[in-house]
Amino acid sequence: MIKVGIIGTGVMGAGHARFIKEHVPDATVVGLSDIDTKKIAELSAELGTVLFSTTNPEELMNDSRVDAIIIASPDPLHVPHLRLAIASGKQILCEKPIATTLEDARMISAEIRTYQERVGKKMINFGFMRRFDPCYQEVRRLIATGDFGPPTFFRTVTRNVASTGATTTGLFTNIAIHDFDIYRWLFKDEWESIQSFYPRRSSLSPDGLADPLIIIGRLKSGVTMVGDVVAFNNYGFDCRVEVICEKGSIQIGTHGDVIT
């Protein structure tokens, strides 16, 4: 049984905790850390497996009862919490983004690489779940067969029902970041450029939030992306992709079906 400690009991931290309880039989949440003791108490009561809690994340990370750590703290705390988690020598799952500035992202990425090279195995993963989705795995397989010819461009849709607490920056670092990651993985390629545009703001979005967001990106191979990101989408969650190749197209439809 893997004993998990979670840093942060907000939307993402509580979501991970509930998922572990309901869907991961060989893991259990034993420790929680947050500055909000009320949230800790509520989540502890809901889970029924928590052995201890603390407002000090370092204390949780170094506790011998914890085998693995989930970092779901506010974005600006990811870098310091990653450093503490690395020092603990335990397996780590960190929510995206890795950092809130490019300088910090490069610095902590280098530290992670050095750490994993030293221990000789992968110790840190980030919250990019689409790589494990059977539909995306099938699209990756179909692209790799070459049966559809070389990809030329692709369209993406990432629309959330209601992203409570979303910020204009957060549309990139918390929502669109899933697109930036999954297409590097699907095409085994790296981004060359990404541009963003803002259409007319939705009246459903909170004041001050630039929503929706239009993205145009280009991978180093020349494959080009056109996508949209919506934080407050009235008709429900909607996540789709269409890859246009020289001999056909591959789609993940509204209902999670792969269409060719």
Predicted regions and their residues:
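Rossmann-like dinucleotide-binding domain that binds NAD(P)(H)
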Residues: 161-224, 229-238
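A short helix->loop->beta-strand "cap" motif at the edges of active sites that frequently abuts
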Residues: 50-51, 88-90, 115-122, 223
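Short active-site oxyanion
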Residues: 27-31, 67-69, 170
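Beta-loop-alpha module in the N-terminal Rossmann-like domain of NAD(P)-dependent dehydrogenases
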Residues: 16, 49-111
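Hydrophobic residues in well-ordered beta-strands that form the structural core
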Residues: 71, 94, 100, 124-126, ...
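A contiguous active-site-proximal alpha/beta segment in oxidoreductase catalytic domains
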Residues: 99-163
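C-terminal glycine/acidic-rich active-site capping loop/insertion
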Residues: 129, 241-260
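N-terminal Rossmann-like dinucleotide-binding module
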Residues: 1-47
